[in-house]
Amino acid sequence: MLKLLRIFLVLICCILICVLGTIYSFIRFKNPSNVGIVARWFGRLYPLFGLKVEHRIPQDQKQISRAIYIGNHQNNYDMVTISYMVQPRTVSVGKKSLIWIPFFGILYWVTGNIFLDRENRTKAHNTMSQLARRINEDNLSIWMFPEGTRNRGRGLLPFKTGAFHAAISAGVPIIPVVCSSTHNKINLNRWDNGKVICEIMDPIDVSGYTKDNVRDLAAYCHDLMEKRIAELDEEIAKGN
């Protein structure tokens, strides 16, 4: 019964957010600030899942005007956990098929996010090449999930290099954002599903990297994030 009630409430809330967010974003058509505002609306739904989410955002975060944020992509619960961490004037890059999701697809487009056609390597490469130009010309940041797909409990998957190429080309830092593990953590028939921690890590300077050693940068970021996720999981397990 609790599961059905939660599903009903979440569906109603998500539809309302999509409708209101679409109207709001049409008024401010593709304004880069739209994404962060709507993402935080979704990010406030976590109590409906019996979760307590701690958001760790550095005090000086607002001083960083342009960056590429990379997050770990676990499952659909990312919408109510790590989505809250999207910063002002940050747009995300998502697969083209998102446009076909009822209500959400039009919202994703009108807020100003960027679609990536993974089926067409040429178009995908061109999209990534344009990111560097947009970051500097429009004074915005980009949010990406470098795993390219939800890992669904398989640990942090190998990173694709698109985000790192874009950061090097634009000359902006990479900022990892991590969320503690949610795989098999949430039981919709259970009132209390525990705690989740989301954290923005320190910026990573990319000035010492080129396209020739971009995979070294990706591997370095992967190792940092993997280690930090394990530390957050351990912290939660200890009850802190």
From Swiss-Prot:
GO terms for biological process: CDP-diacylglycerol biosynthetic process; phosphatidic acid biosynthetic process. It catalyses: a 1-acyl-sn-glycero-3-phosphate + an acyl-CoA = a 1,2-diacyl-sn-glycero-3-phosphate + CoA. GO terms for cellular component: plasma membrane. GO terms for molecular function: 1-acylglycerol-3-phosphate O-acyltransferase activity. Pathway: Phospholipid metabolism; CDP-diacylglycerol biosynthesis; CDP-diacylglycerol from sn-glycerol 3-phosphate: step 2/3. Pfam families: Acyltransferase. Keywords: Acyltransferase, Cell inner membrane, Cell membrane, Lipid biosynthesis, Lipid metabolism, Membrane, Phospholipid biosynthesis, Phospholipid metabolism, Transferase. The keyword Ion transport does not apply. It is found in: Cell inner membrane. Belongs to the 1-acyl-sn-glycerol-3-phosphate acyltransferase family. The HXXXXD motif is essential for acyltransferase activity and may constitute the binding site for the phosphate moiety of the glycerol-3-phosphate. NCBIfam families: AGP_acyltrn (TIGR00530). This is 1-acyl-sn-glycerol-3-phosphate acyltransferase.
